[in-house]
């Protein structure tokens, strides 16, 4: 393939190929190293008692069950709100909006919001959801703050995926007499499932790893609420917040490594479930 190239270009091609391979290997080594370090240091501290109890000085336990439940509650409510809003906004911008200037303004605003530090979202969430709307410091306020944080990501990934659907698909369906919404529901959205799943995975990663915004809005209590409704209206620490508290407030780094390992496994499990759901949807399509 490189026979027609001059010796200098062949050398340059080899150098660039080597650099690309070196970059790929470096990334894989870094990822494997981080995952390995967290698992090696965290797994020895994980036990059934660690996962199924509440932290108690009297009982001498450092369980994280409340934080696990709080994390799952926050993930569920945030995705339940942000996915319909984000996908709907992306569909409007791609399929319905005709004012190009308006679209550009919205896209620019969306990109700007995606780059705002999470601690600012936490401050705004505290002022709006916790104080102005009277929700107080609770999981509901934290979840709504995370909805605002993750909305730009969902919109952007879904919008880019919608743009990859060939225009001929839409025109062909329209020629057969299909309506606009029918085309979107049966052709455009199924073809865009990759982008939607990608946005979902990115959102889950940000939700699980967020601590600054949740410290302002959700709180840091380690108590199991009685019922789902009570949980959302109660102060509660997620796993990422608890990791920070154990490591930097209590100095319990062994427990912090255990929480880190649980977080890592949780993210991997949710990502795997999202990938499997995408495969199932593609098979149905």
What do these predicted ranges mean?
Residues 93, 159, 163, 201, ...:
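C-terminal transmembrane helix and the adjacent membrane-cytosol boundary/short C-terminal tail
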Residues 111-147:
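Generic hydrophobic transmembrane alpha-helix motif, especially the helices
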Residues 79, 158, 180-218:
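Transmembrane alpha-helices
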Residues 56-58, 62, 214-264:
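Interhelical loop and adjacent transmembrane-helix boundary motif
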Residues 117, 176-177, 190:
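Glycine/proline-centered hinge or cleavage motifs at structural transition points of membrane proteins
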Residues 69, 73-81, 85, 89, ...:
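Hydrophobic alpha-helical transmembrane segments of multipass integral membrane proteins
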Residues 3-22, 36-78, 99, 245-254:
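Periplasmic/extracellular loop-to-transmembrane helix junction in inner-membrane transport proteins
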Residues 78-110, 123, 275-280:
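Transmembrane-helix boundary motif in ABC transporter permease subunits
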